[in-house]
Amino acid sequence: MNLSNKELEGLDEIISDHREDFCPFLGRIEEEDKQFFLSSEMKEMYAGDTVPDFIASLQEAVKMPGQIYFATRASIGEWAFVTVFTDTLDYMEVSPTEYQEAKEKTVLGENAAWMPSVDLKPFNRDFPKPSSADFIGKGVEFLNRHQSSRIFMNPEKGLKQLLDFLRVHKYDGRQLMLNNRIDSVDKLKKALKKAQALLKNKSDETEWEEVESDMAHLGFEPGWGKKLGYVKEFLALLSDILAAPEPVVLEKFLDRIPMIFSLVVLSPHGFFGQAGVFGKPDTGGQVVYILDQVKALEHELKSRLDEKGLDITPKILVVTRLIPEAEGTNCDMEEELIRGTDNCHIVRVPFRDESGEVVRQWISRFRIWPYLERFSTEAQNIILSKLQGNPDLIIGNYSDGNLVASLIAQRLGVTQCTIAHALEKTKYLYSDLYWQDNNDKYHFACQYTADLISMNYSDFIITSTYQEIAGTNDSVGQYESYMNYTLPGLYRVVNGIDVFDPKFNVVSPGAAPDIFFSYKSKDRFPEHIEEIESILFEDNLEGSRGSLADPDKPLIFTMARLDKIKNLTGLVRWFGENEELRKTANLLVIGGFVDESLSSDDEEREQIRIMHSVIDELGLDGSVRWVGAHLGKRMTGEFYRYVADRKGVFVQPALFEAFGLTIIEAMSSGLPVFATVYGGPSEIIEDGKSGFTLDPNKGDECAEKLLEFIQKCQSDPGHWIKISDNALKRVEERYNWPLYAKRLMTFARVYGFWKFVTNLEREETVRYLEMLYGMVYRRLADPKEY
């Protein structure tokens, strides 16, 4: 039979040309005492000399009586589904709904009750999107091309929209771009010619005030620039758009419009603070990311406003949760100025229970869902009060922050940016399928529903890597995993998010350059050396286990939260089971608590027990040092450099890492890095050139890779220097905060324009998402479920 999807054409070939390999392959699946099979498992089960395209494309299989359902992914974002009848080798293509129904039957049985299907594809049918995977994560670039084409094809409509957009911008009641003298495209064209003639012979260094009256008479207000050289460039861009719009010109023009003066960053969960919070539950890289982010954004906003000559002080609020039982941190303070900024503040809003009483203690990020709706309302009122009006942009972080951002942005009509940091669905295998088994602990169904709502509400989504969106040829992206999935007994998703959607953009963060800089620098932080050496070598140090019997060995250093995904216990086992590596190097682990009784997090306590067990089992107390310290940023930067001085390495052994800020920090310090191949690190690191990637599922190979590098550096010290220099060069060119801030503000302006010209077209989507929120999310977030 012929299949309509080109992804499945290889099935004909495998049945006709490789039947002798395909039949045993199906037989092995049938013999297994389980119903679900992963891509890696199926590739190992196929015994042919060559791997046909169909086998290579397999992502998952579901075994049912007499037939096997396969999910195939021939290329990024391109999925198809087929069922093969094992007795006859007949097969047929099935829909995403039919495939999900097969999975549901394995959980709920043959007579499962009817379930609704969530399908957002019809709402996006008329929205432009690229067809090539090369454009995934380049949404702004694609939209500029599309919008330029729209203006060119229908200049009357397109230019009228641009005019209306220019007329809408004001601050504190004053127009910034155009006044009421220009109320048509024809008048704009005439006024523009007169303005360019007026400015033509004036010095570029002349300031706006000298021509303000004449320009206002023509219809132009002060937002065009401080100095006339800048104003001339701005007007020339407008002239080019009016004549023949080009994508690059349109982006440059929109990027100069003064439209962002205040923004709100939402990050409710964990202990969000500037000191004493790192190492506490649910508190890690996201806090560092946001604090560095807002510093860079404030600097960018101030620079842009200065170019415009506008005497406006930008304001940034980071809204998080107030925790009265703050455990020695400042998380019980309602407001706190962010150090290193002029007007960026942490604003803390409490969680309240059903009676309105403030919840005093920390709550796991997996259990905060009942509090978020009330939190969003209270936070919105505080935001409006402190900003004296609406923010110009709202940025959500992680699942909880993105949901709150969606609720506030929809109520206020503000542009929303989504940053996931990490989507839990790809971290926990089959966590959607077996959500009911883990509901008491993790509440995954509630979280995944919140994710689905917020990523579709959002005007634009930024990710640190391409893989976060769409994976690789061999692995599924985090967002891609939301294209179709099922929560048996609740609902199934047949079209949840489209990775080709132009709302996706990749922009990578950096590390604070005043903290994380090369070990070669003479301007170091010597005040921390004594404490660093205490952490490494002091006998009977409180909160530590193990000692380094031979302290002169090269040091393998790792530092992360002590949870299952970060896999610190896995690294200790790799190290301990490789005798040669133990003889050659020492291992320092900084993470969690050594004393289980000090932890309030269930998963962390489990990892503490495992860590002690591994050290005991392998007898590692003389070669592994485990410290439960929580380092400040300056201390962390100097720690990386101290390890680099001793020609050590940094290892990030996570089972999955969405980005890997510690990797950027270590590389910025000149420390060679070994990091997981799963997720963002494989984009950051050029394997073998600026660092090394590891497959955490193959611990013996990871240990050998570490050993090989350390031994090579001992025989050839220049090898360590080469990798170190390449790491420094890599982060300098690709991962820095000024570039991040510039791009994010460009995105905000372009998507602000896109929202303006298409807002009415999104109403149907909003109503659909409101229904999903009201009928599903609210029920899952009912306090009685917690």
UniProtKB/Swiss-Prot annotation:
Matches recorded under Pfam families: Glycos_transf_1, GT-B_Sucrose_synth, SUS_EPBD, SUS_N
Q: Which Gene3D superfamilies match?
A: 1.20.120.1230, 3.10.450.330, Glycogen Phosphorylase B
Give the top-level enzyme category: transferase
Keyword hit for Transferase:
yes
What EC identifiers does the entry list? 2.4.1.13
Q: Quickly give the catalysed reaction.
A: an NDP-alpha-D-glucose + D-fructose = a ribonucleoside 5'-diphosphate + sucrose + H(+)
Notes on temperature effects: Optimum temperature is 65 degrees Celsius. Very thermounstable, complete loss of activity after 15 minutes at 60 degrees Celsius.
Report the family membership.
Belongs to the glycosyltransferase 1 family.
Fill in the subunit field for this protein. Homotetramer.
Report the function annotation for this chain. Answer: Catalyzes the reversible conversion of sucrose and a nucleotide disphosphate (NDP) into fructose and NDP-glucose; although the reaction is freely reversible in vitro, the physiological reaction seems to be sucrose cleavage. Unlike characterized plant enzymes prefers ADP as a cosubstrate, whereas plants prefer UDP. Its preference for ADP over UDP suggests it may directly link sucrose and glycogen metabolism.
Name of the protein: Sucrose synthase
* Originating organism: Denitrovibrio acetiphilus (strain DSM 12809 / NBRC 114555 / N2460)
Read off the lineage from the record.
Bacteria, Pseudomonadati, Deferribacterota, Deferribacteres, Deferribacterales
